[in-house]
Amino acid sequence: MALDKNQIAKRIARELKDGYYVNLGIGIPTLVANYIPEGISVTLHSENGLLGMGPFPTTETVDADLINAGKQTITYLPGSSFFDSATSFAMIRGGHVDITILGAFEVTEKGDIASWKVPGKLIKGMGGAMDLVASAKNIIVAMQHTNKEGQSKLLKECTLPLTGVACVKKIVSDLAVIEIVEGGFKLLERAPGVSVEQIRAATEGNLIVEGEIPEIIV
């Protein structure tokens, strides 16, 4: 059983540690805000100028003037700070973000990431991802393992323009949890009911498998 988007986000949330400052990219990463583990305190950063982002609002608490970088309505927690983009990016470029969680079109076995441009589609530009991949201490990617045509998105070399080089540390896809190590993609966990052989078939890059691979707890 492949993981859905919320299950991917929930698994990524278990990577967070108490005291972390965390930036959530657009797409699946924004869902991580709903699954912060009990007993830890993390501060979520939105690059449009908010430190202290909370979970998504209910219909009763929604505020149309309060949005994240992806233009989704959000909440904020007590003690939050609002500031301009220059200050926000000074935090990023200064190396103050412990973990960045990004979506991606492609990731290579060396940790390269392509996350901003698809040929033939009009796009405004790379956005804040270029700063995040260069400055964050740790980068985790949330993504589907294959594209709509069933082709692998975990590659030997990216086919799309790069966002960053050798920067991704870990991937949580709908099929697996994978760590980028010397020599390729190291399989750490697999989605419930998904075999190692299925993951290998869906991975173009070199998949490293050591011993028994546990299932992801969902």
Give the predicted meaning of each segment:
Residues 3-7, 58-218:
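Conserved phosphate- and dinucleotide-binding cores of soluble alpha/beta proteins
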Residues 1-77:
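N-terminal active-site beta-alpha-beta segment that forms phosphate/nucleotide-binding
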